[in-house]
Amino acid sequence: MKQTIKKFSRHRMERSSLCFLTILIIVSFVLQACAPNVSAGNLENMITPLVPTSAPAPTSGRPEYGPGELVDYIAQSGDTLPALAERFNTTVDEIMEANPIIPLDATTMPPGFPMKIPIYYLALWGTAYQSLPDHAFVNGPSQIGFSTSAFVASTNGWLKNYRTYAGEKMRTGAETVDYVAANYSLSPRLLLALLEYQSGALTQPEIPAGKYLLGLKRSFYEGPYLQLVLAANTLNNGYYSWRAGKLTEFELLDRSLIRPDPWQNAASVSLQYYFSRLYAGDKYHASIGPEGLARVYQNLFGDPWLDSTIILPGSLQQPALRFPFLQGHIWAYTSGPHTGWGSGEPYAALDFAPASDVSGCFTVARDLYTTAMADGLIVRADIDGVILDLDKDGDERTGWVLFYLHTATDSRIFVGKEVKAGEPIGYPSCEGGSSTGTHVHVARKYNGEWILAAGPLAFNLEGWVTGGGELAREGTLTRGALVVTACECSDFSTQVISEVSSK
């Protein structure tokens, strides 16, 4: 039987928080001390053509644990208690009981933190082999200094001379990879490795015949660029579903069931999920094993596991944020947690719409502009979104950034502009992405990783905290006893007022 624990006193919570912080600091120092100096991989003579081959089906090799048996687990970047509970088929309460040092208000676990987790065994757990670290998955700090254009120019594959129309302009193959990498916040190295593994993009002179280069069959998504878009979307679906504790099982093309090993990391599970959409049997197991994509990545860019970069540190906290509209104004909360970019996970975004007597797409009054939710520097501003960099280092791949979508072109702020909280970003509109009505779409990223809008690191806007629903776009904003429910209907129950003055 699963057990629950009693409520903890404030004294225990404060003591646990202090002890947990101490361990977090110690673990951080140890990890930094062990971090090697990693240089960019040699761009010459590293490309090894590889196609999917046969391999036996690997298993996790885990024993049939007794119900509630305590197992050892070392926390990984981005781990949260709710997700760990889903992965190990247990409860947050039981994890807390087994690890009393963890405070009740814990967000992310400190990477390297040793834990005991009560496990409830499930059959068909997959391989324990980890093919890619999380920092090599996202478009984060580990990608700084890497030039996709220079790398592709040093190769002899078809991508070098590829040209396509993407994002309202003609782009080279390298520019196309960077465009997809920026929008989905995915590592350009990973996208290049995927293109090489599945199509020989860096070693073969000709593009493989057929409409669906990567094997992802969907109407109107033909050709390398749109296939790469589908691949990026699928990868994000897998990565962030694992982050949220939702991807505990999936099927291969032959309908065989896979349950990712609970000890897995998000990037490796994402690749397992991605290849499950394409293959079955030996071909699937080869693609996720050491001789599959992982080998191609290492041949191209070196061993990613030598880089000790941590994407999400322990006890991560959101900085103070205000609503994305003027103080004293009332807007409608039109959509709860939904995709940050693309479709499906990550459910990182919220939508707000200004008051209006009309529905659909319309031009707003001049005082209904979208505002900065915090002080920062504008590092990207185009139809694909505005990025507000809160640490002002000029790079959206580091630290906290805020993402705005659907700002009108004629009023959009420009790159390089430093803003204070409450200052204009642009007018809400229907421009950019898919939209059925004038609104602004906002999301957060940290070190290149989309931060889920609900959960342990939920949006907190002026004390209003996001709660998720059963489906995308459902959800609430709660402050004390007050609850606002998201609805595209923009009725009275969706209205919320900004009460924080501009600086």
Which residues does each predicted region cover?
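Acidic, glycine-rich catalytic/binding loops that coordinate metals and/or anionic ligands
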Residues: 319-321, 364, 371, 417-420, ...
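Primarily a LysM-type cell-wall glycan-binding module
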Residues: 54-93, 113-115, 119, 131-132, ...
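Zn2+-dependent peptidoglycan hydrolase active-site motif and core
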Residues: 364-415, 437-439
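Ser/Thr-rich, Proline-interspersed low-complexity disordered segments
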Residues: 26-29, 34-69, 100, 120-137, ...
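A structural signal for short beta-strand/turn segments enriched in small hydrophobics and glycine
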Residues: 333, 370, 376-378, 416-428
